[in-house]
UniProtKB/Swiss-Prot annotation:
Keyword Iron: no
Gene encoding the protein: sirG
Originating species: Leptosphaeria maculans
Pathway: Mycotoxin biosynthesis
InterPro entries cross-referenced by the UniProt entry: Glutathione-S-Trfase_C-like (IPR010987), Glutathione-S-Trfase_C_sf (IPR036282), Glutathione_S-Trfase (IPR040079), Glutathione_S-Trfase_N (IPR004045), GST_C (IPR004046), Thioredoxin-like_sf (IPR036249)
Record-given protein name: Glutathione S-transferase sirG
One GO MF term: glutathione transferase activity
Catalytic activity field: RX + glutathione = an S-substituted glutathione + a halide anion + H(+)
């Protein structure tokens, strides 16, 4: 499809997803959690084929979800936000006026950005490719799958040490969750760990954190279905 569908709202924020639910990908659920936490009015639009629908390439040149289209315009063009980390930072910059989720001062924002950037470069990338090679790639390559699973273990070790620090209840800030926690959550679940041949209980602080995050109403609402990492990636 080359033309932009006429049923896409022009007057509100739009979150673009694939398949039939907002939780089609591990990365798509992240901005949805923040939208729920901040009570952001939004529309969810299911893109039939992000790689083939040419109109969507104007929103995200990488041809992937999640992507967000803001109602804000400049010179007649709407503001496009793509890649999950960019979506998280945009949503908190635009709607988190008290800095609860992005950090309220330079110290807190730096902590959040440190852990958010680490996730983007490490566990996020590793988890994504592990899911791809273990569940989607037509040819199973044991050495690659094992290497990626071991890398997940390394990242779990880092998060466990962080959560073992005195008073550290969450990843970036000690007293409350932030977008750094939201970013990591889809890749730190009992189900994903088991699929990687790991036991999340071997990282007790990380397991407790995961269970606490998964119990949040915003997360429950965003998931809206059984958490299945193997089908949450394209």
């Amino acid at each position: 499809m080359t033309e932009r569908p006429k049923d896409i709202p022009e007057d509100k924020l739009v979150l673009y997803v694939v398949k039939a639910t907002p939780t089609s990908t591990a990365n798509t659920v992240k901005p949805l959690i923040v939208m729920n936490e901040l009570s952001i009015d939004h529309e969810i639009y299911v893109v039939p084929s992000p790689t083939r629908d040419e109109w969507f390439h104007q929103i995200n040149p990488h041809k992937m979800v999640p992507a967000i289209e803001s109602a804000e315009t400049r010179d007649g063009k709407r503001l496009n936000i793509w890649e999950s980390t960019s979506c998280l930072t945009y949503l908190t910059d635009a709607y988190d006026h008290e800095g609860l989720w992005k950090g309220s001062d330079l110290w807190e924002r730096t902590q959040v950005n440190n852990w958010l950037t680490l996730h983007t470069a490490a566990l996020g990338a590793t988890g994504k490719y592990w899911l791809y090679f273990s569940a989607i790639h037509p040819e199973k390559i044991p050495a690659v799958i094992e290497k990626l699973a071991n890398n997940i273990k390394v990242q779990y070790d880092i998060l466990e040490r962080r959560l073992s620090e005195k008073g550290q209840k969450y990843i970036a800030l000690p007293d409350r969750p932030t977008i750094a926690d939201v970013a990591n959550l889809p890749f730190v679940t009992e189900e994903l760990a088991l699929k990687a041949g790991l036991r999340l209980g071997d990282w007790p602080n990380l397991q407790a954190w995961s269970e606490k995050m998964l119990a949040r109403p915003s997360v429950q609402k965003a998931l809206s279905q059984k958490f299945r990492p193997s089908v949450m990636i394209r």
